[in-house]
Amino acid sequence: KVNKSQSMACTAKLHYIWNKAFEDGLTAEDDNVLNLDADYMTLMTDDAGNESSKISVGTYFRLMCGQSGPLCLQDTPGVNSALDEVHGRITKEAVEKGDFDRLVYVVNAGAIATNDEHAYMTYLAETRGKDPMVFAVNKLDGFRAGEDSISKSLEGIWEDIRNLGFENAVVCPVSAYAGYLAKKALFDDGMGEDERDELDVMCRIFRRKEYDLSAYYPREVK
């Protein structure tokens, strides 16, 4: 884990996260001071002396499909934070002026069809509607059978994508936290008792047919 993950925007910085060619057990961070062996607290805490809007991190990506060459993820603060307009300004500048191959918009599954979500999708369609776009629908582990419908929620997003005129979009239903726990278990990465209990719950959830997210992905990837 190299960055904070919260429902609310938690930093006013652009994080550039680079993959390393091999695993050496070290994670480097450039946040005002270059640290070639940054520990967890260093990674989770922004340096108050950094007057720029950027933080760079270099680490090995534990990709289940293996490494495929150099990769940089640019993580933005978010745009829907009414508590800090700076976050929205930094993010919009990155979206409008940034040079990237693909834009990933993380959709909170619990906030689908809200006014904020629709307004931002409209903004993306107007500014980047022709570019490759991934809508990662996160937190689907929070859906409850009989109350929520994954298929209907995803179809609602596809309907917005079509109506707003996105030309090159895909929708990827995910549970980032379930994936995080699963990878910690696979790599024997010091899971605590609470995390093991949570992983057991996630496993039970995603064994159910209605939570089979693989059903929404193509069987073959070009």
Regions found by a protein language model. Give the residues of each.
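Globular "head" domains of long coiled-coil molecular machines
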Residues: 1-219
